[in-house]
Curated annotation (Swiss-Prot):
GO terms for biological process: ribosomal large subunit assembly; translation. NCBIfam families: PRK08569.1. This is one of the proteins that bind and probably mediate the attachment of the 5S RNA into the large ribosomal subunit, where it forms part of the central protuberance. This is Large ribosomal subunit protein uL18.
């Protein structure tokens, strides 16, 4: 381990790989709410957060478990379609709470073009939340609606049905054929829009 009078011990959260303080400072200087997006192996989480000296305050939040519980989503919580739907949900929640704009905070996630993190961003923007961005970072539409998953499932079923049933058991046990994921995506998307757009009327 390095030592000496010029050696500085990094902040604990930086050592633990939880916070990039240089990036955080740049975000805080904007003085705007942050659209915080985080990804785990099986889920996505989104929050609208504002800075407070005593600790960040979460104004609204959404989790892919909500998609399953409240809107009947039967797909995986960690894929691109669920990320977009989560973005749509957090965007509508933010608008409902009177939040019109935010800046994206992806933490230590690498800013990979077309990643599911940016699918959350697209969903939030489509819901009407103003977030500075470049559309070039969005995933392609066929990935957002799950067409790539459906095509893979169709091909796998024809080639090896046993492997198909094993790999997509999570879908099948919920009564969803993965080949029909794009249609299911549109159904759940419509439910989210109806809940919030209908409430305005």
């Amino acid at each position: 381990m390095a030592h000496g009078p010029r050696y500085r011990v990094p902040f604990r959260r930086r050592r633990e790989g939880k916070t990039n303080y240089h990036k955080r400072l740049k975000l805080l200087k904007s003085k705007k709410p942050r659209l915080v997006v985080r990804k785990t192996l099986n889920h996505h989480i989104a929050q609208i957060v504002v800075y407070d000296p005593k600790g960040d305050k979460t104004l609204v939040s959404a989790h892919t478990m909500e998609l399953m519980r409240d809107f009947g989503w039967k797909g995986h919580g960690g894929n691109t379609p669920s990320a977009y739907l989560l973005g749509l949900l957090i965007g509508y929640k933010a608008k409902q709470a009177g939040i019109e704009e935010a800046i994206l905070d992806i933490g230590l996630h690498p800013p990979t073009r077309g990643s599911s993190i940016f699918a959350v961003l697209k969903g939030a923007v489509d819901a009407g939340l103003n977030v500075p961005h470049s559309e070039e970072i969005y995933p392609e539409d066929y990935r957002i609606n799950g067409e790539h998953i459906a095509n893979y499932a169709k091909a796998l079923k024809e080639e090896d049905e046993a492997l198909y049933r094993k790999q997509f058991s999570g879908y099948l046990v919920k009564g969803l054929e993965p080949e029909k994921l794009p249609e299911h995506f549109e159904e759940v998307k419509a439910k989210i829009i109806e809940k919030f757009e209908g409430a305005r009327e």
